[in-house]
Amino acid sequence: MYNNYIKEEAELIFANSLNLSRKDVAVMSNNTTSSIITIGRKYGSAGRQIGQEVAKYFGIKCYDKELLEHAANDSGICKELFEHHDEKPTNSFLYSLVMDTYSFGYSSAGFTDMPMNHKIFLAQFEAIKKLASEGPCVMVGRCADYALADNPNCFSVFVHANLDWRINRIAQKYNKNAKEAKDMINKTDKSRSSYYNYYTNKKWGSADSYNLCLDSSKLGYEKCIEEIENQLKLLK
């Protein structure tokens, strides 16, 4: 992995000298993919950072909170509302109501009369599909794997790690003590789990729900990145 890192840095220096983009470098190096990679993650497992590095390797975009901005722009709903409802559970009726309304579009009376949290999910669902139609990319969280379940190019990944490893990482990152870090982890994981389980017919974090599951505390950050890259190369 270290040799790969040196190689990538050399390629970027060369690219900068020629004013090339990361995508140009990926094509020149044959580091290309046709996949839309979705990353589910336990809080503190480094799933977002892993997704960002995979995107850099293949010269494609990575969408995390950027998904909220796209959904806000497309729907006309203010971004702050998306941030307020981001990966937070509502009630168990949401899935059926949203999916019934999905076929009507934003301009329908059904959409207009929906509660705001329903509108948020529907707009986000639409934004995920739209971005995926534009080409390969990485999407982090927001039930993207479920939104793209019918897309043959979707490759879903879930990143997890043992609790002690995550507590240490979050404590260092946010200058928290162990108890504060553990509380942050439990609260966020509970929210993400409830959100995913409400909106989909799958179980958050279950191996059956994803194409690939990785333990970042056991494999390490770089090995997780490498494993995703290798799996995607096999799909070419």
Over which residues does each language-model region extend?
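Extreme N-terminal, non-catalytic leader segments
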Residues: 1-34
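Small-molecule kinase domains that catalyze NTP-dependent phosphoryl transfer to phosphate-bearing small molecules
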Residues: 16, 20, 92, 96-97, ...
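Pre-Walker A (Motif I) flank of P-loop NTPase domains
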Residues: 32-40, 135
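Glycine-rich phosphate-binding P-loop
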Residues: 38-55
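Short beta-strand-centered segment that lines the nucleotide-binding/catalytic pocket of NTP-utilizing
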Residues: 60-73
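ATP-dependent small-molecule kinase phosphotransfer cores
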Residues: 72-136
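RNA pseudouridine synthases
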Residues: 131-134, 143-154, 169
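Conserved phosphate-donor/acceptor-positioning beta-strand/loop module used by diverse small-molecule
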Residues: 150-173, 178-186
